[in-house]
Amino acid sequence: MTRDAGDDQTIRVRVLDIHRSVLEDESVLAEDNFYDMGGDSLLSLQVLGRIERELGVKVPPRTFFTAESIADVADLVAAAAENAAGDDAPRPAGDHAGRASMAQEWALLSSLRDPQAPILQFHAVFRVSGPFDTQRLEAALNRVAERHGSLRTSFTAADGVARQAVDPGARADLAVMDYRGVPDAEVDEFLRGFVREPFDRSRAPLWRTLVVRRDEAEALLVFVFDHMIADGWSLDTFVEDLSAAYRGAELPDRAGQSGAYADWAAGQWESWQDGRAEELADYWRSQLSADPAEFALRLPGYRGTEGLSKPASLVWDLDPATARGLRTACQDLRATPYCVSMSVVKALVALATGQGRVTLLTTNANRLDGAYQSTVGWFANGVFPTTDVELSGTFRDLVSAVRASILGATAHGDMPAMFVRRRIWPELPAGFRKDPGVYFMYNDVWGGGLGFGEGVTVSTHHLTEDADSPGLHMWLLREGEGLRLQALHYESEYAPEYVKGFAGCLVKALDLLTGQPDRPMSELLDPAEFAAVRG
């Protein structure tokens, strides 16, 4: 079959339209670079997914990363179009057994060896107001579990190898409790214990649901997941399917996007053994210091510790003007909120420590393969974007540099962080990270799409979190039009007063740097006004 110029031109127009739609910017031109126009790794997945669904063409993600312009992407699509027939056949997510993924194996074996290992669970709590039927909920939960094999998966370990298996008969774990009239503080205290109760990983399901009745018209809905079977991205898929199932609607069409997790895990091991390990090690050696001690970033307020004690948290709802300023700056800088806010953190760390090269810990969604974009499972990996920070330069220039480091980290973030770190530094002990660092992440509150139909309102209910890893961990969370800063730490490492001072300086720096991105950062970040970050 031959193609004519008209076919290729149609593809170019469609590809450009997809980019404009995802970027929400009709001014985008074919010669523009996707990332220069505000694109990021998450938005790139939307582009790739729509190209595959609407044009029937699967573009290799790493090739997409290297395209100089949207026109180059269109050329890739046009070149691949003749071979696209049949590529969108759905991949079954049926019963399977096989070796666990690299992250799953590392986490399971590490937890068996280390009784102090983090629990590795996450949760979502929602306040549901209006008529809410728990029998319909249970039926919907089981319908979703039937669709996603990971929700029926358990694990075993033998001879240093972890294996996963799907139990075809596993049912959703739903409990209903009546806490009407109980004070809110007591309910939250109970829930904080409930969400941290560990799972028996040898028995499915490794997730549970709790409905807490607060009065006749209101309940709290709690989901708890073992990280072994899901990540934050998975939660969005889960609540979208659950919302449809509860309403009795058809579940979203995920053909070609929900391959079996065990297949992905097998492919990951093959890639590691076929040379990807050295590719990643070479890249990260070029980014990180040869001395692993320099990786463990310690802010001036770090106390040093022989052990971790007194987990603590700080939550700060930012002024609406700060949230608006960030959105405006993102449009001006042609960058995402994640990139812009990470740039602010890097500038502040450079000011606090005097370092000219800053490494932060963050998370990569690791969903570059469109065949698994809607698979529930643990895909996310830790990465370490590293950037030269010159405070005499402008914030605009720093954002550009941070964007490049984020893209590099995303393209080289397809294997678990500990595997990569031990490849670079073989002397590191196996198991969970023991050294401190500074972690930062910006994202929407996961699970925001949950809905149960007309007459029922759903809102997020925030529980006080506990730190479970060394270092200072910060999230900037978008919920609607607002922003919430959350910081987790151990008091044995950082005093609450220091963390509060650092957070206040971060908010102040966010306002100053996004408000005047073309002034030298050294003129905006007066050391006297930011003395709190120096301890």
Q: PLM features: residue spans?
A:
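Gly/Ser/Thr-rich phosphate-binding loops and adjoining beta-strand/alpha-helix segments
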Residues: 29, 117-138, 187, 201-223, ...
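Low-complexity/IDR signal
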Residues: 15, 100-101, 137, 148, ...
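His-Asp-centered acyl/peptidyl-transfer active-site segments
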Residues: 115-121, 149-150, 217-218, 271-280, ...
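Extended, hydrophobic beta-loop-alpha segments that form or line the acyl/peptidyl-thioester binding
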Residues: 58-62, 148, 152, 239-240, ...
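Short amphipathic alpha-helices and their capping loops
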Residues: 79-115, 138-183, 205, 240, ...
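Regions immediately C-terminal to embedded phosphopantetheine-bearing carrier domains
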Residues: 1-114, 118, 139, 143, ...
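Active-site-proximal acidic secondary-structure segment that organizes catalysis
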Residues: 177, 210-263, 495-512
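A short, small/polar-residue-rich loop/turn motif at beta-strand boundaries
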Residues: 130-146, 162-203, 281, 321-327, ...
